Amino acid sequence: MPEDNKAAAKVEPLRKARPCPECGKPSHREHYPFCSNRCREVDLSRWLTGAYAIPVADDETKAEYPDEEN
């Protein structure tokens, strides 16, 4: 490949590298948004063991929906 075409052939990444949510290192494309397989598996483990939870307000659990039958 000629030298002048190498600069034109440079590919821009689709996403900017973001910090890993587990350790803060720059993320890698193979493990996005994590930096490594280890950080990805740590996050998955937290989801599977229930360490992450979406909070629910008390009044939301007793809300009445007109379309539902009791």
UniProtKB/Swiss-Prot annotation:
Q: Its GO biological process terms?
A: regulation of DNA-templated transcription
Tell me one GO molecular function of this protein: zinc ion binding
Q: Which cofactor does it need?
A: Zn(2+)
Q: How is the cofactor bound?
A: Binds 1 zinc ion.
Record: residues binding Zn(2+):
C20, C23, C35, C39
Q: Which Pfam families match?
A: YacG
Q: Known InterPro entries for this protein?
A: DNA_gyrase_inhibitor_YacG, Znf_NHR/GATA
**Keyword annotations for this protein?**
Metal-binding, Zinc
Q: Which family does it belong to?
A: Belongs to the DNA gyrase inhibitor YacG family.
Question: What is the stated purpose of this protein?
Answer: Inhibits all the catalytic activities of DNA gyrase by preventing its interaction with DNA. Acts by binding directly to the C-terminal domain of GyrB, which probably disrupts DNA binding by the gyrase.
NCBIfam families reported in the protein's UniProt record = PRK01343.1
Matching entries from PANTHER family are given as:
DNA GYRASE INHIBITOR YACG
What protein name is recorded for this chain?
DNA gyrase inhibitor YacG
